[in-house]
Amino acid sequence: MAMQFYASPEQIMRDRSELARKGIARGRSAVVLSYAGGVLFVAENLSSALHKVGEIYDRIGFAAVGRYNEFENLRRAGVRMADLNGLSYDRRDVTGRALANSFAQTLGAIFTEQSKPFEVEICVAQVGVTAEDDELYRLTYDGSVNDEPGRMAMGGQAEAIAGALKSNHRSDMSLGDAVKVAVRALGSVGGEGGAARTIAADQLEVAILDRHRDGRTFRRVTGAALTALLDDGAAAASTDAPAAAADSADVEERPDSEAP
């Protein structure tokens, strides 16, 4: 008769945590922060087809690192939940806090009940009337939820990136300044010999939640509009830069939410 191997519950949880952390660390990082005109998402992403940043509802956005198929399934489930609640009750009843709690329950159940946890780290962000009203929620692979103070970094070197963000971030920054701070923070790690890196515009995924818009606020910033924001020689962006950028072909007007 074969001998049955025993592993304590504590060891099983440690092994699952280690698996999830290693999976998250292999991916490239992302940052989310408040600025004068809304909430900014910046992710290092070499793929033009797979998005790490997306929309969930009118004033709610989503960013993630880790396994794409896992966090995209969560985002789609969040879109369906938000659409259902908005149609059944009122669009104002759909909140980032409720969606974060729903994601946390799903991630926690998978972590404790399944043999393999999701290798993901997620941010759910809701833009407010002012920067002080913005809500940023960090969700980890085990279902833990943390309310972040206006800025956050996700990924394998999140602590170092968060340190760079903390020293330079201000909630009253323009969009141009916020993008530069975010990109510098992402480039502060991963360089050869610990040196800072320069990240090209085509390696970045950038989106905003524009607090000055009614209805759907999520917009992507791409192409010439993004290059102009990254250009040190360009004029400083004003707080209404998102609305101006939306008039160009480089900012996508179609939100990537699903129909109910």
Curated annotation (Swiss-Prot):
GO annotation terms (biological process): modification-dependent protein catabolic process; proteasomal protein catabolic process
Keyword Cytoplasm among UniProt keywords: yes
InterPro entries registered for this protein in UniProt: Ntn_hydrolases_N (IPR029055), Proteasome_alpha (IPR050115), Proteasome_alpha-type (IPR023332), Proteasome_asu_bac (IPR022296), Proteasome_sua/b (IPR001353)
One GO MF term attached to the UniProt entry: threonine-type endopeptidase activity
Region annotation Disordered: where it falls in the sequence: 237-260
Keyword Disulfide bond (UniProt): no
Subcellular location field: Cytoplasm
CDD domains, alphabetized: proteasome_protease_HslV
GO CC list: cytoplasm; proteasome core complex, alpha-subunit complex
Comp. bias regions, Basic and acidic residues: 251-260
Pathway the protein contributes to: Protein degradation; proteasomal Pup-dependent pathway
Keywords attached to this entry: Cytoplasm, Proteasome
Role according to the record: Component of the proteasome core, a large protease complex with broad specificity involved in protein degradation.
Listed HAMAP family: Proteasome_A_B (MF_00289_B)
Entry protein name: Proteasome subunit alpha
